Amino acid sequence: LFALGVRDRVFSILLWYIWACLFGRNPLISNPGLPYVGLLLFVHTFLPSAPYGSFDRRKEPDPNNGWRLPQELFVVVWILMAVGYTYSGYTKLISPSWVDGDAFAYVLNSPLARPSFARDILLWMPTSIIHLLTWGALAAEILFLPLSLFSRSRPMIWFNMLMMHLGLIMLINFADLSLGMVMLHLFTFNPAWVKRKESPQVDRVFYDGYCGLCHHAVRFLLAEDARDNANIAFRFAPLQSDLFVAAIPQDERAKLPDSMVVLTGDGETLLRSSAWLRILDRLGGVWRVLSIALRLVPRVVLDWGYDLVASVRGRLFKKQEDACPILPKELRARFDY
């Protein structure tokens, strides 16, 4: 229920209490991620209610309603994460295995190590490389706090530590040790680090006005592109609108899918996965990161997945009676007919 967004602030308190009761369940292993998971649950109780995508927001006319993560909470979590990393690195200076550079080798040879090709490659490497990896991780922890004070080095050190934890999840058969830290990093990701793809003109998103999935997609874009009207990335119009007929020549319209079509500001018509990759690029932040990752997948595979979802959307989502989603007046101003 918490993950679905049903009374999420109430359930976050309950989960925080349960988490606190289980904190010392394994005294043999010190897990630095557990306190941070508790911190995230506690912080969640102070977030504004009903963000976009939550169950409690599903029937609200405004998909976003001005929801924003309070800057104060974001800064507090960042400070605690930075202090925790640097303190953790400082305490490792009294450990001979970290000072000598052997700590990573001990991890790879421990019973917790996950048998894998990546582990075999690391064990095959010269001892000097293992030492450098150990000292590099130690230096990253110690320097996390000072580097996080500067806007240019902050995303770099954040990314380095995230990659370290993802690597440990791959190498160690005990994901709990790093999974909590990965969750912390996701919370502290700043969308401003990944700029949206700029365009001098607004893109037009044409959608099937009677498709339930398309309506959900439009509401998602309205929530994520919640900028002032002078700086928006998208305007919207149904495929059934006069604007679509005027914007796309008849011979070209006959070849287009009846789902979503993006007409860029420079007149390019994008379909299927190409349209959504463009949309994700224009949103910026984590969505542009997703776009970059999806570009590693062959386009034919992405288009196949798009067509598969489009073929079953009518059975999965209720048909809409109104071509324009039910929205507040200021959001309806972003629709053309």
Task: Provide a role label for each language-model segment.
Residues 239-337:
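Thiol/selenol-based redox catalytic cores and closely related redox-interacting motifs
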Residues 86, 208, 264-265:
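Short, acidic, Ser/Thr-enriched surface-loop or helix-capping motifs
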Residues 222-236:
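Conserved helix-turn-beta segment immediately C-terminal to the redox Cys motif
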Residues 92-133:
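Solvent-exposed, well-ordered loop and adjacent helix/strand elements within mature globular domains
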Residues 1-97, 127-204:
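Extended, low-polarity transmembrane helix blocks
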Residues 198-224:
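Local sequence-structure signature of Cys/Sec-based thiol-disulfide redox active-site neighborhoods
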Residues 63-66, 119-122, 235-243:
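Short, positively charged
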